[in-house]
């Protein structure tokens, strides 16, 4: 079978962020036009704009952040195509925590180890079969440990209801992984309140509706950075945005 080698330079336009011109980190896609950017770059841009940076289509007149989503597939592709990018990003995050004198979250440590395990077999000339068996063994080990993200960086949250149409939670104080998303919280609240669908809810921070794919870590960094724990979030029945 014939193979064709392609230089990384030839596909750079497809795996770089138009806003910062760097390789995509925490890739986030606009649902209207499917253009992808770094999450931090896109969120910062949408604080002052409501159009796509590439095609200028209006994402939403008033709540554009509701119509962007984390693109895990694209991020995986970027990490696989660009040698050392994932390790470099994890190193930057570790240095950031060390600089602040904070403990490095378990999820960052785990991703670093995972990246090394993914790269080392190929450097040593091992076969793909060996790589697959190692991956399966690692997944089985993880299931046996039953950690359930307890070693991740944790976020303390207070979930308050600000609508008379819904009742408050009996236990409004929760603690969960910083990698959990707003969607996870919606499902949790819907289950506790016996709602027919989690899509019937909006979750807000500082009176701003949060996108379903926002991680709690992202919310803390962008909406709660200089405030004390717990992170205060409000929920209400979903309102149709015009």
UniProtKB/Swiss-Prot annotation:
Q: Does the keyword Signal apply?
A: no
Compartments annotated for it: namely: Nucleus; Nucleus, Nucleoplasm
For this entry, list what GO says about its biological process.
Answer: random inactivation of X chromosome; regulation of transcription by RNA polymerase II
Q: Which SUPFAM superfamilies match?
A: RING/U-box
Q: Where is this region: Interaction with BCORL1?
A: 132-242
Q: By its UniProt entry, which InterPro entries does this protein fall under? A: PcG_RING_finger, RAWUL, Znf_RING, Znf_RING/FYVE/PHD, Znf_RING_CS
A GO CC annotation given for this chain: PcG protein complex
| Pfam families given in the database record | RAWUL (PF16207), zf-C3HC4_2 (PF13923)
Q: Where does this protein have compositionally biased stretches of type Basic and acidic residues? A: 117-140
Signal peptide bounds: none
Zinc fingers (RING-type) by residue? 17-56
Give the UniProt keywords, A-Z: Metal-binding, Nucleus, Repressor, Transcription, Transcription regulation, Zinc, Zinc-finger
Q: Where is this region: Disordered?
A: 115-149
GO MF annotation: an example: histone H2AK119 ubiquitin ligase activity
Q: What does this protein do?
A: Component of a Polycomb group (PcG) multiprotein PRC1-like complex, a complex class required to maintain the transcriptionally repressive state of many genes, including Hox genes, throughout development. PcG PRC1 complex acts via chromatin remodeling and modification of histones; it mediates monoubiquitination of histone H2A 'Lys-119', rendering chromatin heritably changed in its expressibility. Within the PRC1-like complex, regulates RNF2 ubiquitin ligase activity.
Q: Which PANTHER family match?
A: POLYCOMB GROUP RING FINGER PROTEIN
Give the record's subunit note: Component of a PRC1-like complex that contains PCGF3, RNF2 and RYBP. Interacts with CBX6, CBX7 and CBX8. Interacts with BCORL1.
The protein's name in its UniProt record: Polycomb group RING finger protein 3
